[in-house]
Amino acid sequence: MAQVLTEFDTIAAISTPIGEGGISIVRMSGEDAIKIANEVFKGADLAQVPTHTIHYGHIIDPDTGKTIDESMVTVLRAPKTFTCEDIVEINCHGGIVVTNHILQLLLKHGARMADPGEFTKRAFVNGRIDLTQAESVMDIVRAKTDKARQVAVSQLEGGLLHKIRTMRQEILDTLANVEVNIDYPEYDADTVTANQMADTAKSVIEKIDRLLKTAQEGKILRNGLATAIVGQPNVGKSSLLNYLTQSDKAIVTDVAGTTRDTLEEYVSVKGVPLELIDTAGIHHTDDKVEKIGVERSKKALERADLVLLLIDASKELTAEDKSLINETDSKKRIIILNKSDLGQKITVEQMKKLTGSEVISTSILKEDNMDELEELINKLFFAGIENSNDQVMVTNQRQTSLLHKAKSELEDVIQAVDDGIPVDIAQIDFTGAWDTLGEITGESAPDELITQLFSQFCLGK
């Protein structure tokens, strides 16, 4: 881990969402955090209070002597804080004006506006957390289901860090033997160390493969399963969206073409996070505005992981229905025969025989058979996923790409040993894999990558 750094200036930011609310929090971190807070706080002498204590008082503008707000101020002294620096958190009444006024007061008295993710970056640089734990901070904030939260918490507690470090140590132990052989060639242990490298490479590859098997589930838990609701106009798409979200996000009428754009919403169905996309009806139209909606719907369909295709069961299949069936044939999909209460011209058995897909019959407005739909969504989500109930998962593309790179480097080591290439040459890829795994945790990550990663965080984190 990195050594604790003390040359940072003092930063400040609003840590709660901007807007009206009961409480807002303005956070400072740095060597002068307590001193600056003391200059604007009327109550206890913050310079003298014990660490990890909270104090009632008022925020005062020293220039005017006027009270800005009453507040509760928390004092946390280094090094036992999130950033390993002195931290002060000012709890004030929620609202844009009062919160921003307090922030500006802190900036005026010597703090600097924090960059996005800078609090978490300081925690990383000061050795409090590694990169996987830093990423988990935002995963907890953005978690869409309880399962996603559990995985993020496990990562914050060092679950993935432990697995990566175990693999790196395995490589390092073998590298030590290789270095001895290179430095003392008279012992003629070249074959032994080459075989050790190959065996270690195989062992680490097995561990990498186990992590990579979690990548698909981890990605979906983090980002949601992009789910397009498609069908002809007035087939019940908006009714389905409203049912799944338990709200009236979409307008439901008997007028075709009511939805002229894509509507998006995140929901949890049986623990599966869905990014629902209610599309405009995909059909031929001469209406210019409706055409735009249809084009956006087609793009939404292209990126969808799952398609919920609605067909009016009370009517014979139309040419447009058949076209949609063909267009979605390559996707994971569930075909929903809606309006079954109006009489069925198409049966579940007929549709299954025609498409080979999962099919249910329902009346969405009457909520008939909707439990079966939710079960099917869960079933399709886990199809092809090795679900071990392990809380340690690979949750983003950065981690996945680096694991693939490390695996490739280790495969090159095995090939080099098989080809009889000298140990000191094969060692290059072996060391490369050790470095690549270190990029996942940040122990060997370039500064540019670290800066780019933390820039994706929001202010105050």
Swiss-Prot record:
GTP binds at residues 234-239, 253-259, 278-281. InterPro entries: G_TrmE (IPR031168), GTP-bd (IPR006073), GTP-bd_TrmE_N (IPR018948), GTPase_MnmE (IPR004520), MnmE_dom2 (IPR027368), MnmE_helical (IPR025867), P-loop_NTPase (IPR027417), Small_GTP-bd (IPR005225). Pfam families: MMR_HSR1, MnmE_helical, TrmE_N. Residues 224-382 form the TrmE-type G domain. K(+) binds at residues 234, 253, 255, 258. Its cofactor is K(+). Mg(2+) binds at residues 238, 259. GO terms for cellular component: cytosol. GO terms for biological process: tRNA methylation; tRNA wobble uridine modification. Keywords: Cytoplasm, GTP-binding, Hydrolase, Magnesium, Metal-binding, Nucleotide-binding, Potassium, tRNA processing. Coiled coil: none annotated. SUPFAM superfamilies: P-loop containing nucleoside triphosphate hydrolases. Binds 1 potassium ion per subunit. Exhibits a very high intrinsic GTPase hydrolysis rate. Involved in the addition of a carboxymethylaminomethyl (cmnm) group at the wobble position (U34) of certain tRNAs, forming tRNA-cmnm(5)s(2)U34. Homodimer. Heterotetramer of two MnmE and two MnmG subunits. This is tRNA modification GTPase MnmE. The lineage of its organism: Bacteria, Bacillati, Bacillota, Bacilli, Lactobacillales.
